[in-house]
């Protein structure tokens, strides 16, 4: 029997500021980071009932991500992406998440550098 495909919720183009980088000059002040998140969950119940209780509260996820990013400091974009993924996997409905973090201006002659990770809940 084929596994049921999961539905997707996209949170696109969150622009925030945080201390991010390994070099002293990067750590003096907050820098822009652009974040894109894809939450994967079975949304079929919410499609039938039209009730917020039956879906992922993506506003709550966004608020927690923003609070964490703005209050934290990171050396690596990879670590920032991992912390965001951990938050996104907290709601019981979310099975998988994809997180893309862009650091504009990180490389000379490049508009941005991006890291994308995928994580899923561990089987219990």
Locate each region found by the language model.
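N-terminal, polar/charged subdomain of small-to-medium soluble alpha/beta proteins
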Residues: 1-124
